Curated annotation (Swiss-Prot):
This is tRNA (cytidine/uridine-2'-O-)-methyltransferase TrmJ. GO terms for biological process: tRNA nucleoside ribose methylation. It comes from Pectobacterium atrosepticum (strain SCRI 1043 / ATCC BAA-672) (Erwinia carotovora subsp. atroseptica). S-adenosyl-L-methionine binds at residues 79-81, 114, 134, 141-143. Its EC number is 2.1.1.200. Its main location: cytoplasm. SUPFAM superfamilies: alpha/beta knot. Keywords: Cytoplasm, Methyltransferase, S-adenosyl-L-methionine, Transferase, tRNA processing. Pfam families: SpoU_methylase (PF00588). Belongs to the class IV-like SAM-binding methyltransferase superfamily. RNA methyltransferase TrmH family. It catalyses: cytidine(32) in tRNA + S-adenosyl-L-methionine = 2'-O-methylcytidine(32) in tRNA + S-adenosyl-L-homocysteine + H(+); uridine(32) in tRNA + S-adenosyl-L-methionine = 2'-O-methyluridine(32) in tRNA + S-adenosyl-L-homocysteine + H(+). Catalyzes the formation of 2'O-methylated cytidine (Cm32) or 2'O-methylated uridine (Um32) at position 32 in tRNA. NCBIfam families: PRK15114.1, rRNA_methyl_1. The gene is trmJ. GO terms for cellular component: cytosol.
Length: 241
């Protein structure tokens, strides 16, 4: 199961953080590190701070975009503070661990961490099914990147061990669509709404953001998503006649 957990770092600017994250991952049994457009490439400092987890660094997958890192994933959780202009379904770290361990039994799960200074952008966060916030001391809530990864990775491991102890079934088929399929649905929905005049090109972003939030909250299963796409195709066909 742990092999299905991806730790995704977006535009990391310090190689030392890559090494410290690798160490945090390996102590919890995680090995899949994805680096999205890193501002620096892993170097000797990253290897030194990995402290025995250099294999995690050496096997890291470097990609140009977040979409590439999320390809094939069934669940995506992004780290975020709670104060956002567009509210999103939130998880506590323990809930994040439980849900990640459950869904990683049948498909890859991505846990996404943002830039050291500014975190994830709103556009990046909208690609996530859930956001997770670490309830740190409000008077001093500063966590470095490796600390945040360690906390979330620990919760995933504990949830995984609990599932093993309880004898939970492994490798069950997921009812939920992959991230790629959801993105195709959103593109289809946007095309249909533009075609029917429900939204206009100058103002499509605000409506689509709210619709993304709606479907993220509802989280339709794969068969339900196919029904929705069938409805959209029917609307487009009728509109063209």
């Amino acid at each position: 199961m742990l092999d299905n957990i991806r730790i995704v770092l977006v535009e990391t600017s310090h190689t030392g953080n890559m090494g410290s994250v690798a160490r945090a991952m390996k102590t919890m049994g995680l090995s899949k590190l994805y680096l999205v457009n890193p501002l620096v490439k892993p170097d000797s400092q990253a290897i030194a701070l990995a402290a025995g987890a250099s294999d995690v660094i050496g096997n890291a997958t470097l990609v140009d975009s977040l979409d590439q890192a999320l390809e094939g994933c069934n669940l995506v959780v992004g780290t975020s503070a709670r104060s956002r202009t567009l509210p999103w379904p939130m998880l506590e770290p323990r809930e994040c661990g439980v849900r990640s361990a459950q869904e990683a039994e049948h498909a890859p799960v991505a846990l996404v961490f943002g830039r050291e200074r500014v975190g994830l952008t709103n556009d990046e966060l909208q690609k996530c099914h859930y956001h997770v916030a670490i309830p740190a001391n409000p008077e001093y809530s500063s966590l470095n990147l490796a600390m945040a990864v360690q906390i979330i990775a620990y919760e995933v491991r504990i949830a995984h061990l609990d599932r093993l102890q309880a004898g939970q079934p492994e490798h069950e088929e997921s009812p939920y669509p992959l991230v790629d399929d959801l993105e195709r649905f959103y593109q289809h929905l946007e095309q249909t709404l533009l075609q029917t005049g429900f939204i206009r090109p100058a103002h499509q972003g605000q409506v689509m953001n709210k619709l993304r939030r709606l479907f993220t909250r509802a989280r339709p299963e794969a068969q339900e998503l196919n029904i929705l796409r069938g409805i959209l195709s029917s609307v487009q066909k009728t509109h063209d006649e």
